[in-house]
Amino acid sequence: MGVPALFRWLSKKYPKIVERVKEDTPKKIRGPDGEIVEEPIRYENPNPNGFEVDNLYLDMNGIVHPCTHPEGRPAPETEEEMMVEIFKYTERVVNMCRPRKVLMMAIDGVAPRAKMNQQRSRRFRAAQEAADKEEERREAIKLFEAMGHAVSEETANHKSWDTNAITPGTPFMDLLSISLKYWVSHKLTTDPGWKDLKIILSDSSVPGEGEHKIMDWIRRQRSYPTWDANTSHVIYGLDADLIMLSLATHEPHFRVLREDVFAQSSKGPHACKNCGKVGHIAANCKSDKKFKDPNVAEVAKTEDPKPFIFLDVACLREYLAVELVVPGMPFPFDLELAIDDWIFMIFFVGNDFLPHLPSLEIREGAIDVLLKIWRAELPRMGGYLTNHGKVNLDRAQVILEGLAKSEDEIFQKRKDDEERQEHSQKRRRIEEHKRQDEDKAREEDRNTLTLNGTEYVAVDNPAATARGGPLHPSLPSRPAFDLVPKEDAVKQPEDQDQKAKKAMAGSNSDIVKNRKAIRMANMSAAQALKAELEGGNDVNVDDKKAIAQEGKEEDEAVVTVERTEDEEKEQLTKEEARGTLEEQGEKEGVDEEVVPPAIQTDEDEGEAPVGDATVAENDESTTPEDDEDPTHVPRKRKRGDSDGDEDSNEEDDDDDDDDAPPNPEADQPIPKKKLKVNADGTVDYEDDVKLWEPGYRERYYEKKFGVKLSEREFIDKVTKSYMEGLCWVLEYYYQGVPAWDWFYPYHYAPFAQDFRDVGSMDIKFETSIPFKPFAQLLGVFPAASRIHLPEPLQTLMIDEDSPILDFYPPDFEIDMNGKKMAWQGVALLPFIDQNRLLTALKSKEELLSDDEKRRNSWGDNVMFIANENPLYDLFCDKLYGLRAKDPIPIDTKASYGITGSVLPDPNCVPASTFDTPIPSISECPDLNPNDSISVRYYFPRQAHPHRSILLRGYKPEPARLTESDKDWVRRGGQGGRRGHRHNGGGNGNVTGGPGMARGRYESGPPRTNGYQPPPPRSNYGGSSGYGYGAPAPLPSRPPVSSYGGGAGGYGYSNPYAAAPNPYAGGYGAPAPYAAGGYGQRPYVPPLPPPNPYSAPPPAYGRPPGGGYGYGAPPPRGGGYNPYPSRR
């Protein structure tokens, strides 16, 4: 989720939630012939962490990214080798947890349109950064050649793997799907510990984000009485939103598993990426960068595997149970609904679907600010902000009003803090430079000798060691340097240049005799080239011409440097050639995602700095344009404009917000200034909004939206869209996708001061269907990544007569928007017009091959079981024996409470051979025999909408927090005892990274204190009703109910008042099966929109619908397929 530093903030504020994972490692034993062999981990042994796990869920994108482009070691050469790395990593994670019932592996499928805006931005920036790095690599090669060294053709033509391939619909994702099926079948056949597992694979052909498909499955399962209320869950992933999603399930026995990104290497402190020395970072380094031979392949460093940690959601619930209690409330406290409010307030700070409000930064304590407002206003609000995934708009207005009162103070304090921080950084940099100068002086003193008044210095002379070795075996070897007078050492390079030029004008014998002088002249040419590359804006045009001419003359006079005509014509950038030839090292300041900046995840957590690249920053921001205006005719650019990194002279004006005002400057080229990205990832630029100065609102709306503050109607549209987004996100987390095609049509958020009449906003969502995979690829890919699309679709991204060419600008603005780090800038890309995109795609569909049409279709979830599983014979007899045509409900007794329905898998033949999908890997041969079976699996219908309650039969775990821990929380982290402290990783006593306390991850003191039970609950565990009206005394608990009558529903102030229509009663009466509205208006289910590809399918996205799999509707009570099969 888009909340950088959330995990760090949580682990610092609630220290006991983090536990170190204990994992068994394979033992090395002596084999029967005396050889050393590795004994595999016995999966059936007890879990070494002291607790057993029922269900393990893997957000596979968090595994695929670090395996395909790892940090600190070379990436696998081929995609088949990447599959092997994914197998190894997945097996390590599974062996840590050892689930006993279900292993679910979910890969991101087509995302909701609201997420595509972020995906589009990240992929365009990834392509831009990849192009910058490739340009820097070529410049470094040119510099290396200018020094007289040869570069192999393989090195010169090497191309990096495009990380954008990790997107649904690409051939890579197709290979990933079949490879995981092969690996799962292999494990079920060869590992006896897997015999009772049910493995569910939801690959990229199944719509939905991986983690949300997992949570949708959990919500559906817990709506049935066969579900065990004490099921133990673990979910793996790098995104911080997994914490929020786990809390939102209201399944209390939940843990989040992730790599400990704060763990320090066992090899000691990290060296500077610039000079290779320890003790400082690259941002404070004064030395020249180390230069590496591009012909030398990078060698993997031998480091211990990174440790893993658990985040205990049950312990986090204990902390929140203390923090969220408000004394003197006029209604009973409900922990579950209070947790929902806490989650909702975090959405204000950041999420993947909306830009955060300008006044809210998590590092400035934004969550605590909102929590303080919530605690102060809760009694006056008369109830909670949220209601089982629905937002009470009137109460949301109260929170926004409280924040609005503090915005001016927040902006001023932010500026003061930034100035103090800059002053402190400047002081540290000066001190560090002084220390480096002293170290350099001491080093020079060691290499200096004074004899008879003459100062001698050491001059490198590699030939000294090649003159026959030592003078005598008893003597040391010759030194690799000569001692010369200092004055001669200074004059030596100039003499070498003159000597080389004279030699070049002579005969071949002169050239041979003066090889050293010629080589040194080559070095001078390289230095001139490097000076031009480093010159930046400080070198004027005449100087650059002079340098270029001088370099050209030297190149013509040097026989060892051969430059092609293309190299002579190639234009050089003005920044230092460093690129991928430099050792990247581990990023300083990484917070969440262990992902390089070019592919920032997600799951985009973290403060990952970007290298010394250049980004474009806008002087005039763009605004959403009239995309859907039938009179709008997009301008076209020539195909040649897509080549290179030259500034574009056209402004894209086809954004799809028909509410945006006309832009009179749309046809004028916007000047772009290149900003230098410093070594620490910061960007130097001038902030033209100045939020800390009076009049900032006028400047903000003029610069960011192109309107005046007095244009109230436009600002109201922005605030309504933003509030729609908050409602959409909350419902997405609790009930499923409200509308697949909704998105926020602006690049920036409004101020809290500008929200007015929120309670009267008419917010509702209409049902829609997800994109097909190729439609998403066209929507999020830049033209540079078109290779992953079928050839007929690639022309849509580059041909000058393409109707959607304007979706793929070759260059785009980066607005730093008051931020410091380059990765925090806003990419001002045009919003895509869905109708134009789908129309263009449809015109090319007939040109696709059968296999490409298969890749462009929605797929099925697949369940795998071993031949010893109780379900095996049932599936063989009823599915493959009779070849069932209708989905068959799963026997919940044989499945241990797991519900759903199944159909035969057309790709599975029981007891047959599974051909390997990666034949180049000898360790992965054909699987014969294959003792597993696979079936198409459909999620069950959701018996009722998800409710924020603990289910009946829940057994609490022993309390983790002591009374002193609770007192520390009540004091806001001030005074008292903080609780058991923990280690941030590494070897034993090594302390953790930023934001982590010292000590060790441990379970804390003995759990002697009993768990404080929640208030009395209804039949289904709900506590104290679902919503509250005026702050009048209410009964201590709602009427006992089994979904009939009872607690209030969506939008009604009094939970005990009779609902005026069938949908108003929320969970007490039949709830709407399609997307619901907000406020007091009754909901009328709309008709689903027509399917742009074929006949309209049933509505998708609401919980009572079928699972993510597809097929014919099953009998009543089973899962069903909301989309007809296209295969």
Curated annotation (Swiss-Prot):
It comes from Cryptococcus neoformans var. neoformans serotype D (strain JEC21 / ATCC MYA-565). A zinc finger (CCHC-type) spans 270-287. Pfam families: XRN_M (PF17846), XRN_N (PF03159), zf-CCHC (PF00098). GO terms for molecular function: 5'-3' RNA exonuclease activity; RNA binding; zinc ion binding. SUPFAM superfamilies: Retrovirus zinc finger-like domains. The gene is RAT1. SMART domains: ZnF_C2HC. The keyword Nucleus applies. GO terms for biological process: DNA-templated transcription termination; mRNA processing; nuclear-transcribed mRNA catabolic process; rRNA processing. This is 5'-3' exoribonuclease 2. Residues 984-996 have a biased composition (Gly residues). Keywords: Coiled coil, Exonuclease, Hydrolase, Metal-binding, mRNA processing, Nuclease, Nucleus, rRNA processing, Transcription, Transcription regulation, Transcription termination, Zinc, Zinc-finger.
